[in-house]
């Protein structure tokens, strides 16, 4: 999260193989809501416009859904959730000025591509790009470590800790209700 600086386009794919358990819950509330919560915590702006579509393939509610959320600060998020995929995927990509950040939540991998002003005397192996105006940028690649932990266990432990120590939880009631409000707006589009 420290690497994110006003992303302007966010793309998420949360795809799951079919499991008959859970088809009574809309895919937006079962899967997409996690990405809605992440995006709202990163963007920190109000929803300006939302459009969505969903298709019921196996169950009575949409099994696959896509939503496009436009925020007041200009950021656009495109979210896809499916419970009828052939393989599992949990990826989010952030695009911001001079950086691209890809997070694979399933494989616990992160890829960061950043551009910075090029040095006066670049090395032989430095990757330098030059735009139409002649501005030179150097490309840097990074693969920061992602802790291999149990997200649900961590969430429950921090919640219990907030109760025990009378502190503010990491994810507040407001955060949860806002994610649910946006999820409901998406479902209302179907």
Regions found by a protein language model. Name each.
Residues 3, 42, 162:
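Conserved catalytic core of Hanks-type protein kinase domains
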Residues 42-45, 97-101, 186-189:
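Phosphate/oxyanion-binding loops and surfaces in catalytic or ligand/nucleic-acid-binding neighborhoods
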Residues 98-170:
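C-terminal glycine/acidic-rich active-site capping loop/insertion
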Residues 1-8, 72-73:
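Basic phosphate/pyrophosphate-binding loop/patch that engages nucleotide-derived ligands
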Residues 13, 18-87, 91-95, 105-107, ...:
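Rossmann-like dinucleotide-binding domain that binds NAD(P)(H)
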Residues 5-7, 47, 166:
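A general structural motif
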Residues 6-7, 11-17, 130:
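Mobile beta-alpha loop/short-helix "lid" or hinge segments that flank ligand
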Residues 72, 153-190:
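C-terminal helix-rich "cap/oligomerization" subdomain common to oxidoreductases
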């Amino acid at each position: 999260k420290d690497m994110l600086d006003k992303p302007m386009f966010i793309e998420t794919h949360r795809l799951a193989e079919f499991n008959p358990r859970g088809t009574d819950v809309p895919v937006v509330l079962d899967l997409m809501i996690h990405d809605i919560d992440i995006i709202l915590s990163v963007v920190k702006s109000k929803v300006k416009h939302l459009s969505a579509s969903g298709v019921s393939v196996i169950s009575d509610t949409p099994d696959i859904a896509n939503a496009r959320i436009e925020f007041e600060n200009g950021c656009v998020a495109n979210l896809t959730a499916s419970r009828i995929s052939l393989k599992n995927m949990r990826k989010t990509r952030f695009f911001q000025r001079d950086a691209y950040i890809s997070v694979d939540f399933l494989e616990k991998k992160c890829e960061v591509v950043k551009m910075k002003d090029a040095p006066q005397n670049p090395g032989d192996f430095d990757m330098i790009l030059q735009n139409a105006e002649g501005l030179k940028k150097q490309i840097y690649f990074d693969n920061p470590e992602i802790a291999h932990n149990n997200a649900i266990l961590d969430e429950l432990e921090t919640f219990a800790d907030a109760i025990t120590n009378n502190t503010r939880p990491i994810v507040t009631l407001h955060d949860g209700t806002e994610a649910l409000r946006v999820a409901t707006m998406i479902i209302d589009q179907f």
